[in-house]
């Protein structure tokens, strides 16, 4: 399984 990208939380 490919590592899932970390969701970027807007500031």
Curated annotation (Swiss-Prot):
Molecular function as annotated in GO: peptidase inhibitor activity; toxin activity
Keyword Secreted on entry: yes
The keyword Secreted appears for this protein: yes
Tissue: Expressed by the venom gland.
Gene Ontology annotations of biological process type: regulation of blood pressure
Cellular component terms per the entry's GO annotation: extracellular region
Modified residues (Pyrrolidone carboxylic acid): 1
Subcellular location: Secreted
Keywords for the protein's UniProt record, in alphabetical order: Hypotensive agent, Metalloenzyme inhibitor, Metalloprotease inhibitor, Protease inhibitor, Pyrrolidone carboxylic acid, Secreted, Toxin
Top-level taxon in the UniProt lineage: Eukaryota
Annotated family: Belongs to the bradykinin-potentiating peptide family.
Function statement: This peptide both inhibits the activity of the angiotensin-converting enzyme (ACE) and enhances the action of bradykinin by inhibiting the peptidases that inactivate it. It acts as an indirect hypotensive agent.
Protein name listed in UniProt: Bradykinin-potentiating peptide 11
Species per Swiss-Prot/TrEMBL record: Bothrops neuwiedi (Neuwied's lancehead)
